[in-house]
Amino acid sequence: MVRSGYWNHNVHYQPVILNAVPPGCQTALDVSCGDGLLVARLAERCAGVTGIDRDPRMIATARAQQARARITFVEADFLDYPFAKESFDFVCANTSLHHMDFTAALTAMARLLRPGGQLAVIGLAADKSITDLLAAVPAVPANLFYRAIYHERESGAPIMDPDHSWREVRAAARETLPGVRYRRHLLWRYSLRWQKP
Protein backbone atom coordinates (compact mmCIF):
# COMPACT_ATOMS: atom_id res chain seq x y z
CA MET A 1 0.00 0.00 0.00
CA VAL A 2 1.27 3.49 -0.87
CA ARG A 3 1.76 5.58 2.25
CA SER A 4 1.72 9.36 2.20
CA GLY A 5 4.30 10.18 4.85
CA TYR A 6 2.19 13.24 5.65
CA TRP A 7 -1.36 14.22 6.57
CA ASN A 8 -3.66 17.04 5.55
CA HIS A 9 -7.39 17.38 4.90
CA ASN A 10 -7.05 16.21 1.30
CA VAL A 11 -5.07 13.08 2.23
CA HIS A 12 -7.58 12.44 5.03
CA TYR A 13 -10.42 12.10 2.51
CA GLN A 14 -8.59 10.05 -0.13
CA PRO A 15 -10.25 6.84 1.19
CA VAL A 16 -13.65 8.27 0.19
CA ILE A 17 -12.40 8.46 -3.40
CA LEU A 18 -10.65 5.08 -3.27
CA ASN A 19 -13.80 3.39 -1.98
CA ALA A 20 -15.66 4.67 -5.05
CA VAL A 21 -13.39 2.86 -7.53
CA PRO A 22 -15.52 0.29 -9.38
CA PRO A 23 -14.47 -3.39 -9.30
CA GLY A 24 -12.39 -4.34 -12.31
CA CYS A 25 -11.47 -0.73 -13.06
CA GLN A 26 -9.24 -0.60 -16.13
CA THR A 27 -8.72 3.15 -16.58
CA ALA A 28 -8.84 5.99 -14.06
CA LEU A 29 -8.22 9.73 -14.24
CA ASP A 30 -7.25 12.03 -11.36
CA VAL A 31 -8.07 15.64 -12.24
CA SER A 32 -5.51 18.13 -10.88
CA CYS A 33 -3.43 15.32 -9.43
CA GLY A 34 -0.91 17.47 -7.54
CA ASP A 35 2.00 15.42 -6.18
CA GLY A 36 0.49 12.19 -7.54
CA LEU A 37 -0.14 10.47 -4.21
CA LEU A 38 -3.76 9.66 -5.06
CA VAL A 39 -2.71 8.48 -8.54
CA ALA A 40 -0.30 5.98 -6.93
CA ARG A 41 -3.04 4.75 -4.61
CA LEU A 42 -5.46 4.41 -7.52
CA ALA A 43 -2.86 2.31 -9.37
CA GLU A 44 -3.27 -0.32 -6.64
CA ARG A 45 -6.92 -0.71 -7.73
CA CYS A 46 -6.89 0.12 -11.46
CA ALA A 47 -4.99 -1.32 -14.41
CA GLY A 48 -3.99 2.12 -15.68
CA VAL A 49 -4.15 5.59 -14.12
CA THR A 50 -3.62 9.03 -15.59
CA GLY A 51 -2.98 12.11 -13.49
CA ILE A 52 -3.38 15.53 -15.07
CA ASP A 53 -2.29 18.86 -13.61
CA ARG A 54 -1.53 22.23 -15.20
CA ASP A 55 1.19 23.11 -12.66
CA PRO A 56 4.60 22.05 -14.05
CA ARG A 57 6.06 21.96 -10.54
CA MET A 58 3.43 19.51 -9.32
CA ILE A 59 3.77 17.25 -12.38
CA ALA A 60 7.56 17.20 -11.91
CA THR A 61 7.06 16.21 -8.26
CA ALA A 62 4.51 13.55 -9.20
CA ARG A 63 6.80 12.04 -11.83
CA ALA A 64 9.74 12.03 -9.42
CA GLN A 65 7.85 10.54 -6.46
CA GLN A 66 5.22 8.28 -8.02
CA ALA A 67 6.72 7.01 -11.28
CA ARG A 68 5.81 3.37 -11.86
CA ALA A 69 4.26 1.12 -14.43
CA ARG A 70 0.59 1.76 -15.25
CA ILE A 71 0.83 5.47 -14.30
CA THR A 72 0.89 8.37 -16.76
CA PHE A 73 1.21 12.03 -15.82
CA VAL A 74 0.04 14.79 -18.17
CA GLU A 75 1.01 18.44 -17.75
CA ALA A 76 -1.99 20.31 -19.12
CA ASP A 77 -5.16 22.16 -18.22
CA PHE A 78 -7.85 19.52 -17.71
CA LEU A 79 -10.57 21.58 -19.39
CA ASP A 80 -8.46 22.01 -22.54
CA TYR A 81 -6.87 18.57 -22.87
CA PRO A 82 -8.31 16.40 -25.71
CA PHE A 83 -9.05 13.16 -23.85
CA ALA A 84 -11.22 10.81 -25.89
CA LYS A 85 -14.89 10.74 -24.93
CA GLU A 86 -15.91 7.83 -22.67
CA SER A 87 -12.31 6.71 -22.16
CA PHE A 88 -12.28 6.13 -18.37
CA ASP A 89 -14.00 3.78 -15.94
CA PHE A 90 -13.33 6.14 -13.04
CA VAL A 91 -12.75 9.89 -12.89
CA CYS A 92 -12.00 11.75 -9.68
CA ALA A 93 -10.88 15.10 -8.30
CA ASN A 94 -9.63 15.80 -4.79
CA THR A 95 -10.17 19.38 -3.67
CA SER A 96 -9.41 20.88 -7.06
CA LEU A 97 -12.69 21.79 -8.75
CA HIS A 98 -12.86 25.18 -7.01
CA HIS A 99 -9.75 26.11 -9.04
CA MET A 100 -11.77 25.90 -12.28
CA ASP A 101 -15.26 26.47 -13.61
CA PHE A 102 -17.21 24.02 -11.45
CA THR A 103 -19.99 23.14 -13.88
CA ALA A 104 -17.62 22.89 -16.85
CA ALA A 105 -15.35 20.57 -14.85
CA LEU A 106 -18.20 18.26 -13.80
CA THR A 107 -19.52 18.19 -17.37
CA ALA A 108 -16.07 17.32 -18.73
CA MET A 109 -15.56 14.61 -16.11
CA ALA A 110 -18.94 13.06 -16.97
CA ARG A 111 -18.14 13.16 -20.71
CA LEU A 112 -14.95 11.17 -20.12
CA LEU A 113 -16.72 8.36 -18.26
CA ARG A 114 -17.80 5.19 -20.01
CA PRO A 115 -21.42 4.17 -19.43
CA GLY A 116 -21.57 2.66 -15.94
CA GLY A 117 -18.39 4.49 -14.95
CA GLN A 118 -18.02 6.16 -11.57
CA LEU A 119 -17.24 9.78 -10.71
CA ALA A 120 -15.98 10.81 -7.26
CA VAL A 121 -15.15 14.29 -6.02
CA ILE A 122 -13.88 15.66 -2.73
CA GLY A 123 -14.40 19.39 -2.72
CA LEU A 124 -14.13 22.58 -0.75
CA ALA A 125 -16.88 25.19 -0.47
CA ALA A 126 -17.27 28.61 1.12
CA ASP A 127 -19.14 29.33 4.34
CA LYS A 128 -21.61 32.02 3.27
CA SER A 129 -24.42 31.68 5.81
CA ILE A 130 -24.94 31.25 9.53
CA THR A 131 -25.96 27.65 8.83
CA ASP A 132 -22.65 27.06 7.02
CA LEU A 133 -20.68 28.52 9.92
CA LEU A 134 -22.58 26.50 12.52
CA ALA A 135 -22.08 23.29 10.52
CA ALA A 136 -18.32 23.98 10.54
CA VAL A 137 -18.01 24.35 14.34
CA PRO A 138 -17.41 20.62 15.06
CA ALA A 139 -14.52 20.66 12.57
CA VAL A 140 -12.42 22.90 14.82
CA PRO A 141 -11.78 20.42 17.69
CA ALA A 142 -11.59 17.51 15.23
CA ASN A 143 -8.95 19.37 13.23
CA LEU A 144 -6.92 20.08 16.38
CA PHE A 145 -7.09 16.40 17.31
CA TYR A 146 -5.93 15.17 13.90
CA ARG A 147 -3.14 17.75 13.74
CA ALA A 148 -1.92 16.60 17.16
CA ILE A 149 -1.65 12.92 16.18
CA TYR A 150 -0.58 13.19 12.52
CA HIS A 151 2.26 15.00 10.85
CA GLU A 152 0.41 17.72 8.96
CA ARG A 153 2.03 18.99 5.78
CA GLU A 154 0.76 20.52 2.60
CA SER A 155 1.65 18.93 -0.72
CA GLY A 156 2.92 22.15 -2.26
CA ALA A 157 -0.03 22.42 -4.64
CA PRO A 158 -1.44 25.91 -5.22
CA ILE A 159 -4.08 26.89 -2.67
CA MET A 160 -7.16 28.95 -3.46
CA ASP A 161 -10.26 29.85 -1.47
CA PRO A 162 -13.55 28.59 -2.93
CA ASP A 163 -16.16 30.96 -4.34
CA HIS A 164 -19.21 28.68 -4.26
CA SER A 165 -21.17 28.06 -1.07
CA TRP A 166 -22.13 24.57 0.07
CA ARG A 167 -25.67 25.19 -1.18
CA GLU A 168 -24.44 26.44 -4.57
CA VAL A 169 -22.16 23.42 -4.98
CA ARG A 170 -24.98 21.02 -4.14
CA ALA A 171 -27.42 22.73 -6.52
CA ALA A 172 -24.93 22.90 -9.40
CA ALA A 173 -23.91 19.27 -8.92
CA ARG A 174 -27.53 18.08 -8.89
CA GLU A 175 -28.32 20.05 -12.03
CA THR A 176 -25.22 18.86 -13.90
CA LEU A 177 -25.25 15.23 -12.71
CA PRO A 178 -28.83 14.04 -12.14
CA GLY A 179 -28.90 11.51 -9.32
CA VAL A 180 -25.56 12.63 -7.84
CA ARG A 181 -25.01 11.85 -4.16
CA TYR A 182 -23.80 14.89 -2.20
CA ARG A 183 -22.48 14.68 1.35
CA ARG A 184 -20.89 17.30 3.60
CA HIS A 185 -17.97 15.96 5.64
CA LEU A 186 -16.49 17.06 8.95
CA LEU A 187 -13.18 18.69 7.94
CA TRP A 188 -14.49 21.40 5.59
CA ARG A 189 -15.03 19.05 2.65
CA TYR A 190 -17.94 17.64 0.66
CA SER A 191 -18.10 14.55 -1.54
CA LEU A 192 -19.92 13.83 -4.78
CA ARG A 193 -20.57 10.32 -6.09
CA TRP A 194 -22.19 9.63 -9.44
CA GLN A 195 -22.55 6.71 -11.82
CA LYS A 196 -22.94 7.45 -15.52
CA PRO A 197 -26.09 5.81 -16.94
Which residues does each predicted region cover?
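Conserved alpha-helix/loop element of class I SAM-dependent methyltransferases that forms part
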Residues: 8-26
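Class I SAM-dependent methyltransferase SAM/SAH-binding core
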Residues: 35-37, 41-80
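C-terminal alpha-helical "lid/dimerization" subdomain adjacent to the S-adenosyl-L-methionine
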Residues: 125-172
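A conserved beta-strand element that flanks and buttresses the S-adenosyl-L-methionine
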Residues: 92
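Conserved Class I S-adenosyl-L-methionine
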Residues: 159-197
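Conserved beta-strand signature within the Rossmann-like core of class I S-adenosyl-L-methionine
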Residues: 116-123
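Conserved class I S-adenosyl-L-methionine
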Residues: 26-34
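A short, conserved alpha-helix within the catalytic core of class I
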Residues: 100-109
